[in-house]
Structures are given as structure tokens and as C-alpha cells.
């Protein structure tokens, strides 16, 4: 193989091509590659942070859900206690009202019985006087008559 001018020209052309590529083509390519690597690294870092944030959010959501359930159970328990209290108060009030109505009924019955007794005494006194008048055929004067009636009413 002989070295001739063509080979020397090709070598010089190749060196100029390499120098041109190193000067003008290689730096933008390297910048693009480095920029792409940086974007990928940033994306991976963001993904890692997002995964941690998601995990923290899930833990926080779970805690809030537990707190909400506990609060709901507490509210339900308080409502049940209040319901029982209202029912007990209603029972006490109903018993009080029942006792009041019964006492009022007994008082009314007693009053009616006393009134009926008094009416009956008066009627018996009137009948007794009428019977006595028929027997005595009006031999007793009016003053004695009133005195006898009053005594009969007092006895009855």
C-alpha cells in the first residue's frame, strides 16, 4: 500500500470533519443529552416525592377516616343516651300525669258520693217527715216540726 496524495487529502478532510463535528455538532448534542438526562433525573425525583406524598396522604386520609368514624360513633352514642333520657322523662311525666288524673278522679268520686249522701239524707228526712205527719196527722206545730227535721238530718 502506498501513501499517496489522495490518502493524505482524505486524512486531512477527515480531520477537518472531526474538528468541525467536535466544534459545532458535538457540543449541542452533548447539551441535548445532558439536558435530557437532567429532565429524566428530575422526573424520577419528582416521581419519588410524589410517591412519598401519596403515601403520606393515604396515611393522613386513613387517620381522618378513623377520626370521623370515632366522632360518628360518639355522636350516635350521645343520641342514644339522649333518646333514653327523653323516654325516661316521658315515662316519669306520664306516671305523674296518671297519678294526678287518678287523684282528681278519686276526689271527684268522693265529692259526688258526699253530694249524693246529702241529697239522700234530705230525701229520707222529707219522707220521714211525710210519714210522721200522716201518722200524727198534723198534730205537731211548725217549730217542733223543724226541730224534728233537723235532728233527723243530723242523725242521718
Swiss-Prot record:
A single Gene Ontology CC term: plasma membrane
Transit peptide keyword on record: no
Residue ranges of the TM segments: 7-29
Domain of life: Bacteria
InterPro entries, A to Z: ATP_synth_B-like_membr_sf, ATP_synth_b/b'su_bac/chlpt, ATP_synth_F0_bsu_bac, ATP_synthase_B_chain
Family: Belongs to the ATPase B chain family.
One function term, GO molecular function aspect: proton-transporting ATP synthase activity, rotational mechanism
Membrane topology: Single-pass membrane protein
Protein name, UniProt field: ATP synthase subunit b
NCBIfam families recorded: ATP_synt_b (TIGR01144), PRK05759.1-2 (NF004411), PRK05759.1-4 (NF004413)
Pfam families hit by this protein: ATP-synt_B
Cross-referenced Gene3D superfamilies: F1F0 ATP synthase subunit B, membrane domain (1.20.5.620)
Subunit annotation: F-type ATPases have 2 components, F(1) - the catalytic core - and F(0) - the membrane proton channel. F(1) has five subunits: alpha(3), beta(3), gamma(1), delta(1), epsilon(1). F(0) has three main subunits: a(1), b(2) and c(10-14). The alpha and beta chains form an alternating ring which encloses part of the gamma chain. F(1) is attached to F(0) by a central stalk formed by the gamma and epsilon chains, while a peripheral stalk is formed by the delta and b chains.
Its job: F(1)F(0) ATP synthase produces ATP from ADP in the presence of a proton or sodium gradient. F-type ATPases consist of two structural domains, F(1) containing the extramembraneous catalytic core and F(0) containing the membrane proton channel, linked together by a central stalk and a peripheral stalk. During catalysis, ATP synthesis in the catalytic domain of F(1) is coupled via a rotary mechanism of the central stalk subunits to proton translocation. Component of the F(0) channel, it forms part of the peripheral stalk, linking F(1) to F(0).
Compartments, record wording: Cell inner membrane
Lineage summary: Bacteria, Pseudomonadati, Pseudomonadota, Gammaproteobacteria, Alteromonadales
Keyword list, A-Z: ATP synthesis, Cell inner membrane, Cell membrane, CF(0), Hydrogen ion transport, Ion transport, Membrane, Transmembrane, Transmembrane helix, Transport
